[in-house]
Structure formats: C-alpha cells, structure tokens
Amino acid sequence: MTTKPFFDAARVIAGGKLTQAQVDDLNKVVEKLAPSGKTTSDVGIDLITSFEGTRFNAYDDGVGVWTIGFGTIKYPNGVRVKKGDTCTEQQAETYLKNDLTKFEVAINKLVKVPLTQNQFDALASFTYNLGETNLANSTLLKKLNKSDYQGAADQFLVWNRAGGKVMKGLVRRREAERALFLKK
C-alpha cells in the first residue's frame, strides 16, 4: 500500500503540516490498518461516487442521517456530520478515501473466499452505502463465504430499502452492484 495519499489526507485534516511525532503515530496506524488484501479500483470508486453524488453542504439523506461529500456520515476523527457543516472538494475526497479504507479492511476481514476485483468493488459499494455491520450480518456474506457466488449476487437486490421504503435509487444501485459482481 502506498502511504502518500494517507499522509496527504492527514495533512489536509491537520491544517497543512504534521509534526514528526504525528508522522510516527500515523505510521503505526498505517501498519495496523493496511489492507492485507484487495483495495477498491477506479471502477469501484466510480460506482460509489456515481450513486453517492457530491455535496459540499451537509444534507439529510432522507432518513435522518446528515451526510456530506461523497456520502460521508462521520469525519475521520469520528465526529458525526451535522446540519450546517461544509467541506471543500479536497476534503470530500479525503473523507471518501478514509471511509473506503475502513470498508476495505472490513471486507478483507469478513470475506473468506477468493474475490475478483469486480466482486470486491461491488462489495465496496455495498458496504460504503450500508456499513460494515450490515455486511457482517447479511445473508449475502453467508452465501458468499459458502462459495455460493450466484446466491450472494442475488442478495444485493434485497437491500433496496431506506426507512422501510423501497427507494428507486437503491434499486438501481443494487442492480449495478449485482451486475458488477457477476461481470467476468
């Protein structure tokens, strides 16, 4: 894993500069969190950003969750996004990278079978949208870890609701994730 993007993001969050002590501490974090498996490709990032969109002013996602940038709900420091928050394009990209890293680590930890890059990217989009807990407790993951790739693919389509209601945007997103997961 190249650490330059991580440290670039940390510099933005810190206001431009890092002390040597901060660099040393961040190096320890990188060593612990560096994914031991796959990372999201440009195809996966494009899928995520095409459905998330980009908003530089915090907004309610329709079910009471304040969101900013490319769908970020918590900043890298753990603080939740709230009404009135704003960000720059560079900050939005930093938040996206931070969120993706967390979800990549989770996917690499939870999935026990080989994945193609397309399958990983589809899972990255799914997990970015729904969170690690939903992936961890899903029938999708259970089927996948039993090498039932088709059954896992079909499970994407189940996750099309927000606030108990079927959402057209989620139907489209799950169909796109399923198609990518099955793509050779």
Where are these regions (language model features)?
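Long, amphipathic alpha-helical surface segments
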Residues: M1-V63, T72, V79-V81, C87-V105, ...
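Short hydrophobic-aromatic micro-motifs
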Residues: T67-G69
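Repeat-mediated protein-protein interaction surfaces in helical alpha-solenoids
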Residues: T116-F120
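Short alpha-helix boundary/capping elements
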Residues: T127-E132
